Amino acid sequence: MAGVGGGNDFQWCFSQVKGAIDEDVAEADIISTVEFNCSGELLATGDKGGRVVIFQREQENKSRPHSRGEYNVYSTFQSHEPEFDYLKSLEIEEKINKIRWLPQQNAANFLLSTNDKTIKLWKISERDKRVEGYNLKDDDGRLRDPFRITSLRVPILKPMDLMVEASPRRIFANAHTYHINSISVNSDHQTYLSADDLRVNLWHLEITDRSFNIVDIKPANMEELTEVITAAEFHPHHCHMFVYSSSKGTIRLCDMRDAALCDRHSKFFEEPEDPSSRSFFSEIISSISDVKFSHSGRYMMTRDYLSVKVWDLNMESRPVETYQVHEYLRSKLCSLYENDCIFDKFECCWNGSDSSIMTGSYNNFFRMFDRNTRRDITLEASRESSKPRATLKPRKVCTGGKRKKDEINVDSLDFNKKILHTAWHPTDNIIAVAATNNLYIFQDKVN
């Protein structure tokens, strides 16, 4: 069966897997975010241990024609450390919640990383030369005796082994009372937003000691709280527009030209609920876990527990497309509630041409949907299919009756194995899928 990816028929094949194969995975090693940079040449992951690992794409060469989708470690650094809030007697985890790249302006790369409370701007730069021949100190850094200096030297640059440095340039702190769930860089390349459960703040990349509160849904009496903010993102082209989603399954589009505080939205997107299908779990499964604008800016995609929806910004009443991710779990909601899986936050992503979308599921399955043909495919990130250039076989889940050879029964799904974080290369058919502590990279195999 052909893959889903936009345009020509092709199959997905294995390229690489990063991370240890251990059965007992340390909590700190679990990947918590995955993000390509604007060119797709760099791929960053963050984990629950506060580390950021950046991979760089290998250049194609004639001796290894299949290396175009391969990424190797470029830089690793500790972004966040565990902290303790003494005023509230709360531990602040080091877990990286989100990474967002800034568009590249010069030889260096910049990215934002955040944990629950603190956002940091990192500069990733290369050094392949060092200065030698100082007058006041030796090459090893020791100060020279000024009485022994008899001649003036002109320092020179000497080549050295390539060294990649990650240095923190800005720290944006003390602006969020609740846990940060989103950061999004604006198209003006000067500002970005950060969102927590009840507020959205606007920052300037050069100013760390203050931010502007642009959304505040906190009620005067917290007992009247009925919803929380779950995700927020800037429009890719209009720097005055952004959206934020809620735990009630609604999306609000805001225009910062209307007012400084965007409590009154410009557009309100909500799908009417079918009263006949209402249940105890309806509100939980309608909570939106991710919202992403298409690259064109015409559409936005939202992910709730069971489905992905595509909305036209010009139509607020209902989504233009709805894709069922794992409808077979609807009958299992009670047990998923008991083991807390129903609160899992799945992300979603677009391909470069906005013609296909991808999101994760359980059992290390991930789903792709072709918006033009309406075809969909379920693939699995597993060590069994991790032979170089091995074609991924489509997987199917059966809900009862006789199980075919290649199918897996819904009762056999492993809910501890889940694909929450995925990323699609901005131009090529290369995808990155985080499965617990492993990062799988797949690419197309053109027929």
Swiss-Prot record:
Entry keyword Protein biosynthesis: no
Extent of the WD repeats: 26-65, 91-132, 175-213, 224-264, 283-321, 338-379, 414-447
BP-aspect Gene Ontology terms: cell division; exit from mitosis; mitotic cell cycle; regulation of chromosome segregation
UniProt key word Cell inner membrane: no
Compartments in which it is found: Cytoplasm
Alphabetical keyword list: Cell cycle, Cell division, Cytoplasm, Mitosis, Repeat, WD repeat
Coiled coil: none
One term of GO molecular function: enzyme-substrate adaptor activity
InterPro entries per the UniProt record, alphabetical: PP2A_PR55, PP2A_PR55_CS, WD40/YVTN_repeat-like_dom_sf, WD40_repeat_dom_sf, WD40_rpt
SMART domains: WD40
Primary location class: cytoplasm
GO cellular component, one term: nucleoplasm
Complex formation: PP2A consists of a common heterodimeric core enzyme, composed of a 36 kDa catalytic subunit (subunit C) and a 65 kDa constant regulatory subunit (PR65 or subunit A), that associates with a variety of regulatory subunits. Proteins that associate with the core dimer include three families of regulatory subunits B (the R2/B/PR55/B55, R3/B''/PR72/PR130/PR59 and R5/B'/B56 families), the 48 kDa variable regulatory subunit, viral proteins, and cell signaling molecules. Interacts with ensa (when phosphorylated at 'Ser-67') and arpp19 (when phosphorylated at 'Ser-67'), leading to inhibit PP2A activity.
General remark: ppp2r2d is an abundant subunit in egg extracts and represents 70% or more of B55 subunits.
Role of this protein: Substrate-recognition subunit of protein phosphatase 2A (PP2A) that plays a key role in cell cycle by controlling mitosis entry and exit. The activity of PP2A complexes containing ppp2r2d (PR55-delta) fluctuate during the cell cycle: the activity is high in interphase and low in mitosis. During mitosis, activity of PP2A is inhibited via interaction with phosphorylated ensa and arpp19 inhibitors. PP2A complexes containing ppp2r2d (PR55-delta) also regulate the activity of TGF-beta/Activin/Nodal signaling by restricting receptor activity.
Similarity remark: Belongs to the phosphatase 2A regulatory subunit B family.
Protein name according to UniProt: Serine/threonine-protein phosphatase 2A 55 kDa regulatory subunit B delta isoform
